[in-house]
Regions:
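Flexible, solvent-exposed loop segments that connect beta-strands
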Residues: 36-47, 79-96, 128-152, 182-187, ...
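Short loop/turn motifs that connect adjacent beta-strands in outer-membrane beta-barrel proteins
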Residues: 19-23, 63-69, 109-115
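Outer-membrane beta-barrel architecture
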Residues: 56-60, 101-105, 161, 197-199
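Bacterial Sec-dependent N-terminal signal peptides
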Residues: 1-28, 198-202
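Residues that define the transmembrane beta-barrel architecture of outer-membrane proteins
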Residues: 23, 49-53, 94-100, 152-158, ...
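Transmembrane beta-strands of outer-membrane beta-barrel pores
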Residues: 31-35, 61, 77-81, 99, ...
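Outer-membrane beta-barrel "beta-signal"
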Residues: 164, 190-202
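Repeated loop/turn-to-beta-strand initiation elements of outer-membrane beta-barrel proteins
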Residues: 25, 67-69, 112, 164, ...
């Protein structure tokens, strides 16, 4: 009897997966702001939020056996910058990095053709184009063979947010990510990112 139940449950999962063969792509763009704080944080970073834009794609995988629950990984590119208003050093800094959110999302009906969703999951960020923070300025990485120095490019976060989708075509979403960075070598910074954007489903 137990074996039969196990087989029936497995069949239900498989049938559900087949029934939900649809997989949605989401091309999104929006505004993002990053704030830094912590004992090891520089005076510039602690007093200046880095603001900018992001753009990228997400892909949603459906599991119909668990109604409303989906897995939504993504690949986003962020560009953010800040400029000193006091004339101190550095006068201008910028960051560009790739972000890989790995969200679990729960979708629920709101009204008519509108749905809402909560999502949460880990986020991996990797700096690109040679920007590293060192001695109060961003420099090109010269220690390409030093694996520990390369870790300054990477930071981990945990994100959560809310999204609303209209007519299965347009999605508005907001998220907040909490994380730890080694942007400055041998120092630990807390970095939080607020993102608000629009996505087109296809």
């Amino acid at each position: 009897m137990k074996k039969i139940k196990i087989i029936l449950i497995a069949a239900a999962f498989l049938c559900g997966a087949n029934a939900y063969a649809q997989q949605d792509w989401n091309a999104s763009f929006g505004y993002a702001s990053t704030s830094f704080y912590g004992e090891d944080c520089s005076s510039f970073l602690s007093s200046h939020d880095l603001r900018g834009v992001y753009a990228g794609v997400r892909h949603e995988f459906y599991f119909s056996a668990l109604a409303g629950l989906t897995f939504e990984p993504g690949l986003l590119f962020y560009y953010q910058s800040a400029r000193s208003q006091t004339g101190g050093s550095p006068k201008y800094i910028k960051m560009h990095y790739l972000s890989v959110p790995l969200d679990v999302k729960y979708t629920f009906g709101v009204s008519g053709g509108t749905t809402g969703a909560f999502f949460t999951g880990p986020v991996l960020n990797v700096g690109v184009l040679g920007n590293l923070y060192e001695s109060d300025k961003f420099v090109t990485n010269q220690d390409l063979l030093d694996p520990m120095h390369q870790l300054t490019r990477v930071n981990l976060q945990w994100g959560f947010g809310l999204a609303f989708t209209v007519a299965d075509a347009v999605q508005v979403r907001a998220s907040y990510s909490l994380g730890i960075s080694r942007l400055i070598p041998e120092r630990e910074l807390h970095n939080n990112v607020l993102s608000v954007g629009v996505g087109l489903l296809f």
